[in-house]
């Protein structure tokens, strides 16, 4: 009788909390994917996280390693590792694509695009088959082009396909701002728009602030320019130091974005999204500030950019468009609806 009473009270408590089991799939159990799964679990973003990889045993091993920290860290999320069996990712609320290969010596941009597009195509076909209602978060590089390809391949509405890059770039921008100001990094605001790449991103220094005070009134112009340059080569700086691409901040960025979706937090986050006239850009996927909630992209925010900033965005869009056009030339969009 006592057990039955406790059970019923538990059900009532869960109902009062509007409890809803959530499932997130992370494709790619490399450094970025595994870190994302780990942070998602620690922050209890979802009830279940599925980590999937093509390499035999890799995802299982990473998932087991994460789960063996559960009692130490204190999380209840279940992390499962899977080798290439997408049926176990079925009914995911959010799917994250981190899989892809880095550019190798002697590899052309077109070759890298072709290789990663094939990987993304295979992944997307499996994910959409088993989780047709999911929101897609793309991290694979070149990120803007892979997000654009994912949107075209799935045929999903644009609010359900999101590229993660701008969030990571903005986090790096705020780091360099806080270092220059000598202040708490949580008190700094900064945003990066444009393409995800050291030549295409646009750290918006004019909008940067410390506790609401414009950074332009706190730092000399040359120092701000130094911060902008450091931000733009932030990824390359880490690659040089680490000998490989960064993974901790990218993994945490994924968790931050997914949490805003799953928990309907309506956070303002710069992401790569498909534009249909916003900022004077059409039929292109590029980074702009958006509100992220349960439906994915809830709203695209129109910033009051000046002439110089708009020109930089157009220049960035041109570079991003070249990648997207290359995918068309390579025949990748011929797969759509086939």
Predicted segments with their positions:
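C-terminal substrate-binding/catalytic lobe of Rossmann-fold NAD(P)-dependent dehydrogenases
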Residues: 154-160, 168-338
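Conserved N-terminal Rossmann-fold NAD(P) cofactor-binding segment
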Residues: 54-92, 325-332
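Glycine-rich Rossmann-fold phosphate-binding loop(s) that bind the pyrophosphate
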Residues: 29-30
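N-terminal Rossmann-fold NAD(P) dinucleotide-binding loop
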Residues: 33-34
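Rossmann-like NAD(P)-binding element
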Residues: 71-134
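Rossmann-like NAD(P)(H) cofactor-binding subdomain of soluble oxidoreductases
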Residues: 108-174
